[in-house]
Amino acid sequence: RDLVRSRGLGDVYKRQKDSFVEKVADYQSYPDNWNFKGNKPCLVDFHAPWCVYCKALSPILDQLAKEYEGKLDIYKVDVDQEPELESAFKIRTIPNLLLCPLNGKPTMKLGTMNKNQLKELIESSLLSE
């Protein structure tokens, strides 16, 4: 239930709270100073099914998951189904992207972007190390 195959375009992971704590961040134990737990950089898309901008972003993330397969993990968190994650990461507006580089501090990026803008963001924020 955690891994969703996206029409053959690549793997996009839908995160629930327990697997988020295990694979991305233990925000419960360290709410103000958590560390990224992954072995590849990741992008976490906080979204909702009713959000028009989120719907536009979703297929782009599916494409990027395929393009960056093996280099980057892309996760999706439905804030309607995961209110604890929404609250823990202070998500007030969606779409909201959490960028977790292997080294360095995670950052948030608010709003939607086209594919080229997202690729630039991934390259500069997550894969430039």
Language-model segments: what does each one mean?
Residues 17-41:
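A short beta-strand-turn-helix
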Residues 93, 98-129:
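Non-catalytic, surface beta->alpha helical segment in thiol-disulfide oxidoreductase systems
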Residues 18-21, 83-84, 116:
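Acidic phosphotransfer microenvironment of two-component signaling modules
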Residues 46-60:
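Conserved redox-active cysteine motifs that mediate thiol-disulfide chemistry
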Residues 86-90:
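Short glycine-biased active-site loop of nucleotidyltransferases that positions the nucleotide triphosphate
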Residues 15, 46, 65, 69-84:
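Thiol-based oxidoreductase modules, predominantly thioredoxin-like and allied folds used
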Residues 39-42, 46-50, 93:
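Short pre-active-site segment immediately N-terminal to redox-active cysteine/selenocysteine motifs
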Residues 1-13:
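Single conserved hydrophobic/aromatic residue that forms the stacking wall/gate
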